[in-house]
From Swiss-Prot:
Record-marked site positions (Stabilizes the substrate): Y17
Pfam family, one: Ribonuc_L-PSP
Catalytic activity: 2-iminobutanoate + H2O = 2-oxobutanoate + NH4(+); 2-iminopropanoate + H2O = pyruvate + NH4(+)
Superkingdom in the source lineage: Bacteria
Organism: Bacillus subtilis (strain 168)
Underlying gene: ridA
Binding site for substrate: R102
Major subcellular location class: cytoplasm
EC code: 3.5.99.10
Name of the protein in question: 2-iminobutanoate/2-iminopropanoate deaminase
GO CC list: cytosol
Length: 125
């Protein structure tokens, strides 16, 4: 059984995909970039962009019946590995006691020239 997830509290997909999908008791998010729910890009520094990404992730996780506490894996894409520590600083505010598995990779470019994109896999409550 699969179910697409959509919430107006996170930006709409900018391509032919859903904000996330539930398969059985697992939620797989699409990558979130620092767009506001209205679709405007947050053009601040890496910390501001990362906070917006987490706001978007929170919205899709909640819509799926999951939360940061049920995330089992996160994948972080950053445009510049020199900003790894700053991303980690913000990331740790959302995963302070619960620490899911994670990968972090530097990429040549992200959609809309974002500095960071994060996707998660979580258990649905």
């Amino acid at each position: 059984m699969t179910k697409a997830v959509h919430t107006k509290h996170a930006p709409a997909a900018i391509g032919p995909y859903s904000q996330g999908i539930i398969v059985n008791n697992m939620f797989y998010s699409s990558g979130q970039i620092p767009l506001t729910p209205s679709g405007e890009m947050v053009n601040g520094d890496i910390k501001e962009q990362t906070h917006q990404v987490f706001s978007n992730l929170k919205a899709v996780l909640e819509e799926a019946g999951a939360s940061f506490e049920t995330v089992v894996k996160a994948t972080v894409f950053i445009a510049d590995m020199e900003q790894f520590a700053e991303v980690n600083e913000v990331y740790g505010q959302y995963f302070d006691t619960h620490k899911p598995a994670r990968s972090c990779v530097e990429v040549a470019r992200l959609p809309k020239d974002a500095l960071v994109e994060i996707e998660v896999i979580a258990l649905v409550k």
